Amino acid sequence: GRTLRQASFKQDTKLERTSLLALQNATDLVKILKWNMDNNVKVFRIGSNIFPWNSEYEVTQLPDYSTIAEYLHLAGQIIKQSGQRVSFHPDHFVKLASSKPDVVRRSLHDLNHHNWIFDMMNLPATYHYPLNIHVGMNYSNDITEKFCEQFNNLNHSTKCRLVVENDDKANAYSVKKLYKNIYSKIGTPITFDYFHHTFNDDGLTSKEAAYLAAETWHEYKPLFHYSESKNLNENVSGNPRAHSDYALLTLDDYGLNIDVDLETKAKELAWTLYERNRHDKMVS
């Protein structure tokens, strides 16, 4: 989504430019959802920056608020009419278990803000429209306790949408650790990220982790993440955890009935290639 630098935001004392950017982001979202409908895209992650610097003002203060609200309502109608499953994945700075009170405050605000957008779209407050985050910190009993404590400070409908994803660092939260320490305490479903699991399997095969994560969704269809290594696909050196522009393979769903969010830099081009490869694999 469109945004503006902090210095520019501070100069926008009447929120006119900020409001215009939010309106453009809302209209762009409607266009994208219509494109998805025309091209049979059924799973889509909505960008997190519809409202730039939203922690610094009340959204209802924006000069274009009523028009923005109409576009969000229209977006929700398109989503339901076309059967799209949409999600949010707020930024990495969201850390409910942080020891810094300001980080926790901003994290709670950010999650409730994303949830409010879903509410504005009139989408049910369920895991069908998930709000996906990481614990985002190294595993410890103290971090687990803080995360669960702050979870209870979220708005009720935010809690009804929140899901947690396995991390890609060996000392962080694997699927197994999320199951034993987060899901077992607060019932939050686990988003299985195939790529992250390759860096932090915690003794589970990919199939075992996928089944363990799927179990936590109960009556809801699990939404998993799939991506591939930029180093391998594009023959470059660098961070092995960096995502490739395209997914050249197709995931193994291990017989599970799941939805998949494709995490690739090339967006709709990557999706088109992935679907073509998936179709070719099915008919071969």
Q: Language-model features: where?
A:
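Alpha/beta catalytic barrel-like cores
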Residues: 1-85, 94-108, 112-123, 127, ...
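Short acidic, Gly/Ser-rich segments with clustered Asp/Glu that frequently serve as metal-coordination loops
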Residues: 170, 195-201
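Conserved, mostly hydrophobic/aromatic
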Residues: 89, 193, 260
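Long, compositionally biased, intrinsically disordered segments
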Residues: 188-191, 199
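Short glycine-centered, acidic/aromatic-flanked micro-motifs in structured strand/loop junctions
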Residues: 90, 133-135, 164-166, 262
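Short, internal active-site loops enriched in acidic
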Residues: 50-52, 92-94, 135-140, 169
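A general structural motif
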Residues: 142-147, 206
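Glycine-rich phosphate-binding "P-loop"
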Residues: 129-143, 234-240
